[in-house]
Amino acid sequence: METQLQSIFEDVVKTEVIEEAFAGMFMDSPEDEKTKLTSCLGAFRQFWSTLPQESHEQCVQWIVRFIHGQHSPKRIAFLYDCLAMAVETSLLPPRMVCQALISSDSLEWERTQLWALTFKLIRKIIGGVDYKGVRDLLKAVLDKIQTIPNFVSSAVVQQLLAAREVVEYILDRNACLLPAYFAVTEIRKLCPEGALSHWLLGSLISDFVDSFRPTARINSICGRCSLLPVVNNSGAICNSWKLDPTTLRFPLRGMLPYDKDLFDPQTGLLRYVLEQPYSRDMVCNMLGLNKQHKQRCPVLEDQLVDLVVYAMERSETEEQFDDGGTSQLLWQHLSSQLIFFVLFQFASFPHMVLSLHQKLAGRGLIKGRDHLMWVLLQFISGSIQKNALGDFLPVMKLFDLLYPEKECIPVPDINKPQSTHAFAMTCIWIHLNRKAQNDNSKLQIPIPHSLKLHHEFLQQSLRNKSLPMTDYKIALLCNAYSTNSECFTLPMGVLVETIYGNGSMRITLPGTNCMASGSVTPLPMNLLDSLTVHAKMSLIHSIATRVIKLAHAKSSLALAPALVETYSRLLVYMEIESLGIKGFISQLLPNVFKSHAWGILHTLLEMFSYRMHHIQPHYRVQLLSHLHSLAAVPQTNQNQLHLCVESTALRLITALGSSEVQPQFTRFLNDPKTVLSAESEELNRALILTLARATHVTDFFTGSDSIQGTWCKDILQTIMNFTPHNWASHTLSCFPAPLQAFFKQNNVPQESRFNLKKNVEEEYRKWKSMTNENDIITHFSMQGSPPLFLCLLWKMLLETDHINQIGFRVLERIGARALVAHVRTFADFLVYEFSTSAGGQQLNKCIEILNDMVWKYNIVTLDRLILCLAMRSHEGNEAQVCYFIIQLLLLKPNDFRNRVSDFVKENAPEHWLQSDWHTKHMTYHKKYPEKLYFEGLAEQVNPPIQLQSQYLPIYFGNVCLRFLPVFDIVIHRFLELLPVSKSLETLLDHLGGLYKFHDRPVTYLYNTLHYYERHLRDRTNLKRKLVHAIMSSLKDNRTPGWCLSETYLKCGMNAREDNVWIPDDTYYCKLIGRLVDTMAGKSPGPFPNCDWRFNEFPNPAAHALHVTCVELMALAVPGKDVGNALLNVVLKSQPLVPRENITAWMNAIGLVITALPEPYWIVLHDRIVSVISSAVLSSGSDWLGYPFQLLDFTACHQSYSEMHCSYVLALAHAVWHHSSIGQLSLIPKFLSEVLKPIVKTEFQLLYVYHLVGPFLQRFQQERTRCMLEIGVAFYEMLQAVDQHSNHLAYMDPICDFLYHIKYMFTGDSVKDQVERIICSLRPAMRLRLRFITHISKMEPAAVPVSNSSSVQQTSSASSPTAQSTAGAAIPLSVTQ
């Protein structure tokens, strides 16, 4: 091949000797040149046609090498002409030629003439290269230019500029050689933000990059760096807040020149989240940290250190370290965060201590030093035994800095809890010294002089064998010697003995035959708070081990109340999670169950029901799954345990947070059976109600009409297989539409009341006619016989006023589990009986019998009977009768009302502050004993039966507390049926006080007002009554101002129907301001301080958000008006809203409005419509200035030049940034049905792109279907604008944005829909978008191999400057 090529080309360039001698005087005529060219090409064409395809590239490379081997510029120019002609006549492919030229090693800037000629040739033929080839050539040309040094002779610059001309041509928007989007990507890879382009290219590159700033802005959320989340404990993944774990930057898509603040590390956001209690899961979520993979995260480490420094600064300004003050809460939280992140190796302890030393040096901050050492002691004492001593020695550097005293520090007052902090440094020294001794290390440090008195005090206390519980000496010793087993045994032994009780003392527990160890006073919280994590772990480990040991031993003596209460208190500490709640669920419960220690099992379930706070959702669902498997075991088929298992399961189900339901249940999609009950219809119904509420509140089903393909489908299908049932139409009408459709399709035939009546009569006849006692017992208790026995007992009492002994025996034989089915049938039977009773005397008789069955004979407990009644699916009149029975059961006799009023009067819900709970508990049970084994019936039969039921220990529960989750359900059922509103008000009047003991009263109100918004719209009185009943039950146990605003309490609570209170703008501003101040961490904050570990909400912002939403939903004002008033807080000029803080207010409005039902937030769509229809955007006349500048809210706001449309844009972004994906999924419909018909001008189109562009990334991650619909809508709007506009001024930014969508999001998924649209656009637009469709025939002729394509319409988008830095380099690898 090479020989043939050589002969072809050497022939052409061969010259005579005389020509060479007189080189400057000989000149070929143009005809000779042409002849030479033609003959050379002819010979080459013949050769090329015989050459196999695979040798083509090699051949072209040889030719380039041959040309570059020539020294005569004339020869080179001639050969280049040959190449150009070969390309023009389609003999050689231009891409191959260009690539061979640019990649030649001989192409060096020093050979200036070769350089100039080569780039002129490339410039001439590059028009024929396909767009991906042009991209590769651009990259190669830019790389070649980088080889030119910064200093060259000015004489050669002219020749070097040929390369610049090639780049200029490639970047020419009108030539359209490739999507400009490709070009900017290559440029930004080479010159990231802040890097200067090569001098040869000058402003060419920077101007081109600047032309992409509008595209970057279209994809940016206004004020994104100021938006903050509310941290919850749901475990839901939230894509809006993800950050890069190495740089803390937002994960921005595409190599666009975003504004500088978007490229900055988002330390403010991470710091804010870290400051919130219970935020560690969210931090892991944001940074993508996985507990399984130990990976150090330096940026997280820095923020933790900064937080400690901030806490030190706070301590300087606080007068005293008061109990429960903000400073104490902050230090408490810090130690919890530090332990978690260091334990899982996301942060390195020695690095953090050294960094702290560096940041505190020279600051003179020493007021908080004890608290800092307390935080460090937590980690040191727990991990020093497993790690090298060297890891902990940097603490001594910190000591030298913070404890400059030359004299001894005096011993603090050890009657105060903060004394444990004052001793922290001494404890650290003791642990370090102990480690050094054990390791025989030479690093032993003598006790610093300033700590001598502290050390002596501890040594002396150790020698004192009787330690009192009245001061903090025990805590001090535990903290100092937890790594020294000889010394630790004494103080820990005292704590343990206090709660275990000494072996001899016994006390009785509620019920018969139930005895427990005698210790009743738990360890107080401030003592537990004063123990280091290591000491707490030893204590909880000791308790758990003892419980397991007692379970194995099948001890008949129940656990001491003090032990149970102390164990519950220890489970609140997140820092001991592995031994705490994790051990409780995955080790203790299974062990106890395996040992068949039913008393201890009952105790653990009671603890979970009445004493646990902020348990992560996956643990709760794991327990629920345990309970369902427990329910199937024969041994749990006893009245008390069965009742406890069902009650606990009911609490777990109804307490699931709306944002917790989907993430938790999707974990069980492969086996939904494990989280569902195989036999309890009530529990499965409760789960469906929870599911309906959760999907409504999170707007999961918004915009869809079927559950097909969702995580709910298998769950619902399995429930219907286990416990087929129907729903009453008034309940069903509140379900989200897809759930309604499912139950209408899966309708279950109901047994008619006539049949039920007939069957009861039939069975009753048998009862009366059978004589053999054994036959009767066998027949009525047999498995599979109709569950009608309670109906028969009812008839016996109605006809004979008594039940005989056989009745009792049958009940015993039926067993707790099977009896539930009898209660269910009985509930239906009662409704039919009451419906047909003649009223008056007979009705009173019916009520009396029913009450006797509950309170006199103890046949069924009130909470179970009411739950069954509330969960039946009666319609119309029968539903009213059912609710009437519930009301009578609860209010008619005094039995239950007295129990409630006494319990509410005598007890307080703050169990963690009490030392005498057990005494009050016993007093109550003595007055109102629980009878769970038909005791009343046993006494009444003739002859009476002597029962010796063995009760399981009851430490916390009673009928009132068990009734609370049932009451939640009852209220909801009553709300659904309009005619029973008055009855509900009566119930709330008499029993509302119970909400004092509800563990989530505000959340319950929030869920209720949200879920029933449609039902309560016009029932403002009932709404107010509900809020009033629940809030006033809590007034004695909450600080004033903890929930509802003063204005609302004054005007909203006492409003009359004829004089409805309509709040003014000031009211809404103050309400939003309260949330803004809370999130800003203002001190003192708008809400009273509290211990968040025992609060309903995990942190102040979550509390503020929920109480704000409850108050707004409780107003007697339509949702639409409230929504508009909230938007007006920033859209109208409000004196209470500070200009400089406007994005924080928008953030708060976004949080509040998205947490409200649809009518409240959908008004934003109306505002957007009015802006898009406004003259400014629709007139089409040129604006003063440049639209991209006007839509840059932050810059305009700072320069006081913002307009209404930019305010609405920024607010819409804040709202949508906080929206759930369900709420966002209405955007495609909004675009296609509402905005598309209005958008006619370029400004309107750009406004819509700005509005929706930033959310495509979220749609891609969470609802791809919506992203594709939006992509198509964008093209349809462009088509309308193209048809309505004579001139398009911003074609380039529009096309850049559409390319961004293609390469970052949609790929070719919408190609078929948009091809048709692109074909219909004006030629200039078609030319620019031709690479999206790949339709060559629509190109306005192949781009000529000459100067520039002649496109008449130019794009005049010069761009304002703004700064930015390279985003995540996402390769353009979407299928093209």
From Swiss-Prot:
Q: Name one GO biological process term.
A: negative regulation of neurogenesis
State the superkingdom: Eukaryota
The GO cellular component terms are:
mediator complex; transcription regulator complex
Keyword Transcription belongs to the record: yes
According to the record, the signal peptide region is none
Low complexity bias located where? Answer: 1346-1369
Question: Cellular location of this protein?
Answer: Nucleus
| Keywords linked to the UniProt accession | Activator, Nucleus, Transcription, Transcription regulation
Disordered: annotated span? 1346-1376
Q: Which family, according to the similarity comment?
A: Belongs to the Mediator complex subunit 23 family.
* Protein name, per record: Mediator of RNA polymerase II transcription subunit 23
Which gene is annotated as encoding this protein in its UniProt record?
A: med23
